[in-house]
From Swiss-Prot:
The modification N6-(pyridoxal phosphate)lysine is found at residue 106. It comes from Methanoregula boonei (strain DSM 21154 / JCM 14090 / 6A8). This is Cysteate synthase. Specifically catalyzes the beta-elimination of phosphate from L-phosphoserine and the beta-addition of sulfite to the dehydroalanine intermediate to produce L-cysteate. Homotrimer. Belongs to the threonine synthase family. Cysteate synthase subfamily. It is an enzyme of class 2 (transferase). Its cofactor is pyridoxal 5'-phosphate. Signal peptide: none annotated. HAMAP family: Cya_synthase. Its EC number is 2.5.1.76. Pathway: Cofactor biosynthesis; coenzyme M biosynthesis. GO terms for molecular function: cysteate synthase activity; pyridoxal phosphate binding. GO terms for biological process: coenzyme M biosynthetic process.
Length: 424
């Protein structure tokens, strides 16, 4: 039987035999990428992201599932003077047929990742999150009864809730920021029975998020000229680039990559600063001179990753370079105006990160960076929280344990081991 896909090291070009690998066994500092046997996008009869099952690294769908929706808005187009603006929305809005009850496009990556891990050995994923990713995995855990370990900064605990009581979530709150949560999660992933979710290195995560571009291309009949999104790690933007590469290989949706227009939230803008000088590596003293305080000031905490997959082979630097991309620094005031614009024209309360992306589009339209008749895709990566609260009861997730930012010791691992044993 011909395998559905294989994975290849982007930097070295070699095929990696172990499809569970998160890194190149030859030692290249590089992401791995899926290569699907089917070069043509074949739509399935399933709903949500599994409509694009042929380009997801799983053999069966996880149902029921939601997915991104692509639509246009005459009102928003008129407001910005952009005649061919399309919106990709991953959140909750029954009027727009959007059914992600965690309110975030992180649900797209969680669906693909949970199903893939289940198929590859039923390991329990350990996820570090600034809020949205953790909520997505917790929400699907509650829906499907699959155990997950979520590690978040203490400040993000309030952003973790589900619409079904979560019985299978081990939540660790870390007194620190997102980078500290990543360090703790790395240690916990060594507990037997657990496995690191992988972040940007996880091909299922990227291919799941890439369905936003697949859905847009199918809906519009072509790859858009421009793609707008706010980024913290930039994994979603890498996913958009990779999805576009596959669509070009298909041959029916165009031959040109979309230009990536990516935004960060002032005053924390390390990717903006590094890309302005076309540097592949960060200089912390220039790009993150006062990171702890800068992170506290942003309106969108999920955009504050201090260690994004920027310089790694196949990472965000390469995506920006390949697409002649542009970075935008968006102030909180601009973000709030972007939030009001989406609310007024689409009737959706957007996630703050999506408001930042909208503000970047406003900047680009005003500067003439995008033309009035260009095909543009704005990725509204989350929203609809007010409607979720109207339609569902929300169940907050209480931490199983709270630790300091330097805690990676045996006591914490032993507590997790006891919890994991219930699923053995």
């Amino acid at each position: 039987m011909i395998p559905k896909y294989r994975i290849r090291c982007i930097s070295g070009g070699e095929i990696v035999p172990d499809i569970t690998s998160l890194s190149c066994p030859a030692g290249h500092d590089s992401l791995l990428r899926t290569e699907y046997t089917s070069r043509r996008l074949q739509l399935s009869y399933h709903s949500g992201i599994f409509r694009y099952l042929c380009w997801l690294p799983v053999t069966a769908p996880l149902l029921p599932s939601g997915g991104p929706v692509t639509f246009t808005s005459d009102e928003l187009s008129r407001e910005l003077g952009l005649s061919r603006l399309a919106i990709s929305f991953s959140g909750y809005s029954p009027e727009h047929h959007a059914s992600l009850t965690t309110g975030s496009f992180k649900e797209l990556e969680a669906l693909a990742t949970l199903q893939r891990l289940w198929e590859l050995g039923k390991k329990i994923p350990v996820i570090a999150s600034a809020g949205n990713t953790g909520r997505a995995f917790a929400g699907l855990s509650a829906q499907y009864g699959k155990p997950v370990v979520v590690v978040v900064p203490s400040s993000a605990v309030s952003r973790l809730w589900t619409t079904t009581p979560a019985q299978d979530v081990f939540l660790v709150a870390v007194d620190g920021d997102y980078t500290d949560a990543i360090a703790v999660s790395t240690a916990l992933a060594t507990v037997p029975g657990c496995v690191p979710e992988g972040g940007a290195r996880n091909v299922a995560r990227r291919d799941g998020m890439g369905t936003t571009v697949l859905d847009a291309a199918v809906t519009l009949g072509r790859i858009p000229d421009h793609y707008f999104q706010a980024v913290g790690s930039g994994t979603g933007a890498i996913a958009a680039w990779e999805a576009a590469l596959r669509l070009i290989g298909d041959g029916r949706y165009g031959t040109k990559l979309p230009r990536l227009h990516l935004a960060q939230n002032k005053p924390f803008t390390p990717i903006v600063l590094a890309w302005q000088q076309r540097r592949r590596t960060f200089k912390p003293e220039l790009d993150m001179p006062d990171a702890p305080n800068a992170i506290k000031e942003v309106m969108s905490p999920v955009l504050t990753n201090r260690s994004p997959p920027y310089g790694i082979g196949g990472g965000l630097f390469d995506a920006l370079q390949a697409t002649e991309g542009q970075m935008y620094a968006v102030s909180n005031d601009e973000g709030k105006k972007g939030m009001a614009l989406i609310r007024d024209t689409l009737g959706i309360d957007p996630d703050p990160a999506a408001a930042v992306a909208t503000a970047a589009l406003v900047q680009a339209a005003a500067a003439g960076t995008v033309g009035p008749d260009d095909s543009i895709l704005l990725n509204i990566t989350g929203g609809g929280y007010e409607r979720i609260r109207e339609d569902y009861t929300l169940y907050p997730i209480e931490p199983s344990v709270t630790v300091n930012q330097h805690e990676t010791g045996d006591t914490l691992k032993a507590e997790l081991s006891r919890w994991v044993a219930h699923y053995g």
